């Protein structure tokens, strides 16, 4: 027995309450004989929804559709009502859980008819369960009472003396001297039910011939225990009871034509039902306030069933007749409140005295240990919680300050490095020449594979070997599979500088099997001084080199690594197979050799396709040099890098590649165009002070100033269809633009050093072999996407190259776009029921600064998503839960503003505000009217007035930058350590 007692004590410890809501069902009875001429105004439109069919008045405050756990129509049987609305709750009693089943409704709505059937079906199922579990011993006890005119009577006794109610600390409210019969079998129970039916008070009214004049409560108590010890799970004794409550119906004296005794009975019935409604309504709101259980004997007896230790099911019966519409609405209102009530049902375990003693001993030991070794005190008061939150806020502020300091430090370091580069290169002169062209193509390709930019087949990341590529004087794009190289630029440096390595602060080293690679082209001061001794040479032009590629099987992209702090990338360059003819390989190699010997000589492809591709620029002596722009089937993009501080303009190399040798396209470069460079600008005015592209690549800070110098506010680059445009831009205009950039650059970084000639860029057109059909599809898909996104290729002059469309646009466009987006956001606030305080903060914080673009965009997208979620209404016509929640929160905010007006505004201020908002000073509830008016319209004057008023009521200080950063913390972009890209910084 000791083990059994321990098991019982353990079961006592583990008997935990389970929270659940009251199960509410609605049964709609058919029209009776008295209602034959009346219309039916209620209809069950779904298994869970009942709807009012007639027209609802315009100012009606009640809904037209009601949703519950289950709704039964006039054709539903009592058996169906029991199976779907009460069976699960009724059978909980055999598992040791208390349960109660109510029937609630107006008089003559079918409550007694429903409860009689449910009681019979429950008894049959309980006895069926007992027969299927012979391993447990069941003891059933039955009692019955009625509450007639607030007097408790025993239905199993012929004595009509009212019984007293007693409060027991363990059992709760009990009825003194109540008869409790131990049942022998189900026939015995049926006989007792018949006795109760005969003893109950009934009477005749105008609405019902057999109207119940009292509340009836039938209680069936079941005690079960194991016949022998079968293990831990079946050793305890369980005791639970089920209550079948048939409430008397609410009635109106005018409808029932009651008088005398019937009138007195009706008044007591209505009073007890009113108390029941108060209790249910208070429980539906929570257990914070006082719950008037003791105002009625009915609620006092059923206290445990209403929000206590029991599972509860309520069946609300109603008449569909129009004459009872008001009583039907009251019934549905009661059901709506009841489904929000939460109960805490738990298994009732009975323990022996020894088991109870052991349980109490363990509990005593636990309490003593807590006293001796108290646990660390948690935040139990509001003050402690506030202190903890303040500490967290200070910690976050400290982290934010450290991050801002770190950002400023890095920014200053970058500025110093850029300034150092300006000083280093002010006296340096680097001449450009081509490498030895006498070597064969095969030898050239083999050497270039070790010295050039290359693309790894496994990683797809280009890199540069500084030891070989830079200091041996070649910049070559190479493909490991084809051994085909593109000579791009050659730089000669003295021998003593060829083996020095320089590490860029922006680029981490990439590793290759042959040597360490870095991605910076910056020279140190020592290298610059040595380079200044190199003789100066003028730049020469090398025309198109067409190279035929073989064995091309997969597409390949050159992705240039850019600094982490800039979003500009080398644009994707493509040319279709139709743009360039395909000569034999021998002719191509011969063409390469000839062009390397004589840079001014045209390749055969240029001669044949002169109209489609490029017009050869005239010789160096030509005075009227032109820069010609053409369109072809490919899209070629350029970047104008940031001007060098000494005042130089560099045009990025123009490289045409096939669809399988495409450079990755920057998202910021939306315009694709092609420029054919002129003959070498022999004039020192044109060629002097041109730094390497790679240096300019890392100086993006002065883009905005350069853009403003290139484009006036009213200047908008034109877009011309690429299939129809063929025009020329004179070199004078280009030189004028270059001079403008030179002046801007000199203003930004003045230098007294002599302007030296550096490298100019070359252009080369690459003819590529036709690939397989898969690659053709890839090119077609890309071109289709380009056509859809751009509509037509935008052709710009050299000054437009590489500048993002958002930057190159006129600065005057931002205020217009800002006002348009702000108006859309205000409209979305109105549609999405956005919080008023949030609207006020946002409206006052973001007033049109260009840096606010990201916050405006994120807010617009967030509200658009909320609006889409609002539009997805659930089945049954019920309002979206998100919409209901947002409306509730909005109403709470308005109530808060209503209260704040009393605290924050003086009487004079109130009168001025009322006059400004058009509220009559003689009207009532002026503060309530004002709180309902703010943020209800979308015109800008109303918005400004609303934001100003709310800011004053909530004591919103003048917006500062720190506040804006905290407000937009969720939208801040921060770099990720593992990639050179941006990601969202979550909070």
Curated annotation (Swiss-Prot):
Gene3D superfamilies: Kinesin motor domain. One of its GO terms (biological process) is microtubule-based movement. Residues 350-420 form a coiled coil. Keywords: ATP-binding, Coiled coil, Microtubule, Motor protein, Nucleotide-binding. Residues 21-341 form the Kinesin motor domain. Residues 709-733 are annotated as: Disordered. InterPro entries: Kinesin-like_fam (IPR027640), Kinesin_motor_dom (IPR001752), Kinesin_motor_dom_sf (IPR036961), NACK_C (IPR021881), P-loop_NTPase (IPR027417). ATP binds at residues 105-112. SMART domains: KISc. Belongs to the TRAFAC class myosin-kinesin ATPase superfamily. Kinesin family. KIN-7 subfamily. This is Kinesin-like protein KIN-7H. It comes from Oryza sativa subsp. japonica. The lineage of its organism: Eukaryota, Viridiplantae, Streptophyta, Embryophyta, Tracheophyta.
């Amino acid at each position: 027995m000791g083990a059994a007692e321990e098991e019982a004590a353990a079961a006592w410890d583990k008997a935990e309450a389970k929270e659940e809501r009251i199960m509410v069902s609605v049964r709609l009875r058919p029209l009776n004989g008295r209602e034959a001429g009346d219309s039916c105004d209620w209809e069950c439109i779904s298994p869970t929804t009942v709807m009012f069919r007639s027209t609802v008045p315009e100012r009606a405050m009640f809904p037209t559709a009601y949703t519950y756990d289950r709704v039964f129509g006039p054709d539903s049987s009592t058996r169906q009502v029991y199976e779907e609305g009460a069976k699960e709750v009724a059978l909980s009693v055999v598992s040791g859980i208390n349960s109660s089943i109510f029937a609630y409704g107006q008089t003559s709505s079918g409550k007694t008819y429903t409860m009689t059937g449910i009681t019979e079906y429950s008894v049959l199922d309980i006895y069926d369960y007992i027969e299927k579990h012979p391993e447990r011993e069941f003891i059933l006890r039955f009692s019955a009472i009625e509450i007639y005119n607030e007097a408790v009577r025993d239905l199993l006794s012929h004595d009509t003396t009212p019984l007293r109610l007693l409060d027991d600390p363990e059992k709760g409210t009990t009825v003194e001297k109540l008869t409790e019969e131990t049942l022998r079998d189900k026939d015995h129970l049926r006989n007792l039910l018949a006795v109760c039916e005969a003893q109950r008070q009934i009477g005749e009214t105008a609405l019902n011939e057999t109207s119940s004049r009292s509340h009836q409560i039938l209680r069936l108590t079941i005690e079960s225990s194991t016949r022998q010890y079968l293990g831990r799970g079946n050793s305890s004794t369980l005791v639970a009871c089920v209550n079948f409550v048939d409430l008397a119906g609410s009635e109106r004296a005018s409808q029932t034509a009651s008088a005398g005794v019937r009138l007195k009975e009706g008044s007591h019935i209505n009073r007890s039902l009113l108390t029941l409604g108060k209790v249910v309504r208070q429980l539906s709101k929570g257990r914070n306030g006082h719950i008037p259980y003791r105002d009625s004997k009915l609620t006092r007896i059923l206290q445990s069933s209403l929000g206590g230790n029991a599972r509860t099911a309520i069946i609300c019966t109603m008449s569909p007749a129009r004459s009872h519409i008001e009583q039907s609405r009251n019934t549905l209102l009661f059901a709506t409140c009841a489904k929000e009530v939460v109960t805490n049902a738990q298994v009732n375990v009975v323990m022996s005295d020894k088991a109870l003693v052991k349980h109490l001993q363990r509990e005593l030991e636990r309490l003593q240990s807590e006293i001796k070794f108290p646990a660390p005190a948690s935040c139990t008061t509001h003050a402690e919680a506030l202190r903890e939150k303040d500490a967290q806020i200070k910690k976050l502020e400290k982290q934010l300050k450290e991050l801002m300091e770190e950002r400023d430090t890095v920014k200053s370091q970058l500025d110093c490095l850029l300034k150092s580069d300006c000083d280093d290169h002010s006296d340096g002169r680097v001449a450009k020449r081509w490498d030895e062209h006498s070597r064969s193509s095969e030898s050239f390709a083999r050497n270039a594979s070790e010295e050039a930019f290359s693309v790894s087949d496994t990683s797809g990341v280009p890199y540069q070997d500084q030891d070989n590529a830079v200091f041996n004087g070649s910049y070559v794009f190479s493909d490991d599979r084809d051994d085909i190289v593109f000579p791009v630029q050659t730089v000669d440096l003295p021998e003593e500088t060829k083996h020095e390595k320089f590490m860029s602060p922006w680029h981490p080293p990439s590793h290759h099997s042959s040597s360490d690679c870095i991605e910076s082209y910056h020279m140190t001061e020592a290298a610059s001084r040595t380079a200044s001794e190199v003789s100066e040479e003028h730049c020469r032009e090398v025309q198109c080199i067409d190279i035929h590629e073989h064995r091309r099987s997969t597409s390949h992209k050159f992705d240039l690594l850019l600094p982490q702090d800039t979003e500009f990338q080398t644009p994707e360059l493509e040319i279709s197979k139709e743009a360039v003819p395909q000569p034999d390989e021998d002719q191509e190699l011969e063409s390469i050799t000839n062009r390397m010997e004589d840079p001014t000589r045209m390749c055969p492809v240029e001669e044949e396709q002169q109209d489609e591709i490029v017009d050869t620029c005239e010789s160096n002596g030509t005075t009227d040099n032109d820069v010609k722009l053409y369109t072809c089937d490919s899209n070629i993009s350029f970047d104008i890098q940031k001007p060098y501080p000494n005042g130089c303009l560099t045009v990025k190399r123009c490289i045409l590649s096939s669809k399988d040798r495409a450079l990755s396209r920057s998202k910021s470069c939306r315009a694709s165009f092609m420029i054919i460079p002129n003959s070498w600008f022999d004039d020192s005015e044109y060629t002097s002070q041109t730094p390497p592209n790679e240096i300019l690549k890392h100086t993006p800070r002065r883009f905005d100033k350069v853009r403003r110098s290139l484009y006036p506010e009213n200047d908008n680059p034109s877009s011309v269809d690429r299939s129809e445009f063929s025009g020329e831009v004179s070199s004078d205009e280009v030189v004028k633009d270059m001079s403008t950039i030179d002046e801007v650059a000199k203003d930004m970084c003045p230098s007294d050093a002599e302007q030296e000639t550096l490298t100019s860029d070359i252009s080369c057109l690459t003819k590529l072999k036709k690939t397989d059909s898969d690659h053709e599809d890839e090119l077609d898909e890309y071109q289709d996407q380009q056509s859809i996104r751009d509509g037509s290729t935008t052709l710009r002059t050299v000054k437009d190259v590489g500048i993002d469309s958002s930057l190159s646009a006129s600065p005057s466009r931002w205020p217009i776009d800002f006002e348009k987006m702000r108006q859309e956001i205000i409209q979305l606030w109105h549609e999405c029921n956005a919080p008023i305080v949030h609207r006020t903060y946002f409206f006052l914080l973001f007033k049109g600064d260009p840096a606010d673009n990201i916050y405006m965009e994120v807010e617009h997208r967030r509200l658009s998503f909320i609006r889409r979620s609002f539009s997805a209404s659930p089945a049954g016509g019920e309002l979206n839960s998100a919409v209901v929640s947002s409306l509730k929160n909005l109403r709470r905010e308005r109530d808060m503003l209503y209260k704040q007006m009393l605290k924050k505004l003086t009487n004079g201020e109130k009168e001025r505000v009322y006059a400004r908002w058009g509220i009559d000073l003689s009207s009532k509830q002026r503060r309530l009217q004002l709180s309902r008016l703010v943020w209800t319209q979308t015109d800008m004057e109303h918005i400004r007035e609303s934001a100003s008023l709310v800011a004053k009521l909530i004591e919103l200080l003048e917006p500062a930058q720190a506040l804006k950063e905290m407000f937009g913390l969720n939208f801040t972009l921060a770099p990720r350590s593992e990639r050179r890209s941006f990601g969202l910084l979550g909070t």
